[in-house]
Regions:
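Hydrophobic anchor at the beta1->P-loop junction of P-loop NTPases
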Residues: 6
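Conserved lysine of the Walker
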Residues: 14
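Small-molecule kinase domains that catalyze NTP-dependent phosphoryl transfer to phosphate-bearing small molecules
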Residues: 116-158
Length: 161
């Protein structure tokens, strides 16, 4: 099974690109890591992130057993190296083919996308500041795609190469 991991700051387009890929590749499951850590109120600490990683790996393992599923797209903000390592180690144990991509964009693009997104409850000024501050960290990761001046289709094509 092929697993594509889309990482990056909030608002960069992980979900949009991930859903586009899933919609255009039959047999693809879409997982948003946020679903695996949906505690109210939100608590993003080591314990809850470890639980989310376990939930993600269980979901992918179940999709792997499903005859109609040939690929999984996982989107999640993974700003701590241990999270990515745990997921990739788990996928390696499943003998999955993994492609890990980090999406980034310019500060201006992130602000514009943030302001244009009226569907996400996280699109507050406070979270925008958190996301903007995280840009340099994501920009230093490997396998970067700068989505600033690209369409969803163009980003998806680059991810699938």
């Amino acid at each position: 099974m092929k697993v594509i991991i889309l990482n990056g700051p909030m608002g960069v387009g992980k979900t949009t690109v991930g859903k586009y890929i899933a919609d255009h590749h039959p047999g693809t499951a879409f997982i948003d890591g946020d679903w695996c850590l949906d505690i109210h109120p939100f608590v993003g600490n080591q314990e809850t992130k470890a639980m989310a990683v376990d939930n993600i790996l269980h979901m992918i393992g179940n999709y792997q057993k499903c005859s109609v599923c040939s690929m999984v797209v996982l989107v999640w903000l993974m700003d701590e190296p241990w999270v990515i390592q745990k997921i990739t180690q788990g996928l390696s144990a499943m003998q999955a083919e993994v492609k890990n991509v980090t999406l980034v964009c310019s500060r201006e693009n992130l602000i514009r996308r943030w302001k244009d997104d009226h569907n996400c409850e996280w699109r507050t000024d406070e979270w925008l500041n958190v996301s903007l501050k995280s840009l340099p960290g994501f920009a230093s990761m490997e396998n970067i795609i700068d989505t600033s001046d690209l369409s969803v289709e163009q980003v998806a094509e680059l991810v699938m190469q």
